Regions:
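Alpha-helical multi-pass transmembrane bundles of energy-transducing inner-membrane proteins
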Residues: 1-39
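Membrane-interface segments at the starts/ends of alpha-helical transmembrane spans
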Residues: 2-4, 85-100, 176-192
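Hydrophobic transmembrane alpha-helical segments of multi-pass transport and channel proteins
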Residues: 13, 17-21, 106, 110, ...
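Alpha-helical transmembrane segments of polytopic integral membrane proteins
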Residues: 20, 24-27, 36, 75-76, ...
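Predominantly late transmembrane helices and immediately cytosolic-facing juxtamembrane segments
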Residues: 20-24, 97-137, 192-220
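Interfacial and helix-entry/exit segments of alpha-helical transmembrane bundles
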Residues: 28-86, 93-107, 130-155, 228-234
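Short amphipathic alpha-helical coupling elements at transmembrane boundaries
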Residues: 40-47, 121-128, 172, 222, ...
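Aromatic-capped, Gly/Pro-kinked transmembrane alpha-helices
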Residues: 160-193, 209-287
Length: 287
């Protein structure tokens, strides 16, 4: 169990370093190109930022531990180690490991919601501002490192057992008697997930292309319940997307809602804009 636990911890550290670095650099390029770090001022970037945008999607899916990517492999090892410890230990230690399993599962759910909002609001839809509509794709000096980090995430997902074996020397420093053979063998079936997911996506792409062959292609706005002139302002905002989860986690986040009614510039008399914001009452220094 010692070898499994240390291998899982080090692999998880490496996976988070790769995925988070890709996300930080990628969305730094987004902020630089669009001139804003506000999700509500972004949108519509994935179509024009195909390479960097695709890496951001991969990085977000990886950090949310989606099966087939690198962070899922290390989380799988962490769960294996925690559950193995629960079966081997008793009393307070067993309860503590049970709490760790719950905390890991809870944080995974929060990560999925967080990065679904990041990608869905920041990259998809239509541009929510003029700066987002005209944001130029980053050059190779800025986009190249993002692509390399995305490739590293895919490499670890494809060969997690080899990466764990490469970490054997580091594990031996903190746990000289540890054996990482269990960790390496536990990851062999996980390595098959990435080819399986890639094959399924390729099959869907081929079927879609075959079914649409010869049919005219027309681009249009998304369905808006019959409304013929939707605007970018009618899309989900980051606040509205996260509102259900924010309400559920209110006792933990200690948030409060602020509702403002404003009159848009140039609007007819009586027109109002509803603005709803969630703010945290917890000082930022404690977060």
């Amino acid at each position: 169990l010692a070898g499994l636990g240390w291998a899982a911890a080090l692999l998880h550290l490496w996976n988070h370093a790769l995925a988070k670095a890709a996300l930080f650099l990628g969305f730094g390029a987004v902020a630089q190109g669009a001139g804003s770090r506000s999700l509500d001022a972004l949108g519509g970037l994935l179509r024009r930022w195909r390479l960097v945008g695709s890496v951001l999607v991969i990085g977000a899916a990886a950090i949310a531990a989606v099966p087939g990517l690198n962070v899922f492999a290390s989380e799988w090892l962490l769960f294996r180690g925690l559950l193995g410890g629960m079966m081997a230990l008793h009393g307070v230690a067993q309860v503590a490991l049970l709490g760790a399993v719950g905390a890991l599962a809870f944080s995974g759910g929060i990560a999925i919601a967080c990065f679904a909002r990041l990608v869905g609001i920041g990259l998809l839809g239509t541009p929510r501002s003029a700066s987002a509509a005209g944001a130029p794709p980053p050059g190779w000096a800025m986009g190249g490192p993002v692509l390399l980090l995305g490739a590293a995430c895919v490499f670890v997902a494809a060969a997690p057992s080899g990466v764990v074996r490469a970490l054997a020397a580091a594990v031996g420093i903190v746990a000289p008697a540890a054996d990482i053979a269990t960790a390496s063998s536990a990851l062999r079936p996980i390595a098959m997930l990435l080819p399986a997911v890639a094959a399924a996506m390729a099959l869907l792409a081929v079927l879609r292309r075959a079914m649409g062959r010869g049919a005219p292609v027309r681009r249009a706005m998304t369905w808006a319940c019959g409304y013929a002139a939707p605007t970018a302002a009618m899309q989900y905002t980051s606040t509205s997307f996260g509102d259900p989860l924010t309400r559920v986690l209110h006792p933990v986040l200690r948030t409060e809602a602020r509702v403002e009614l404003a009159t848009p510039a140039g609007a007819p008399p009586g027109a109002r804009t509803l603005v709803r914001r969630w703010t945290s009452v917890t000082p930022d220094r404690l977060l």
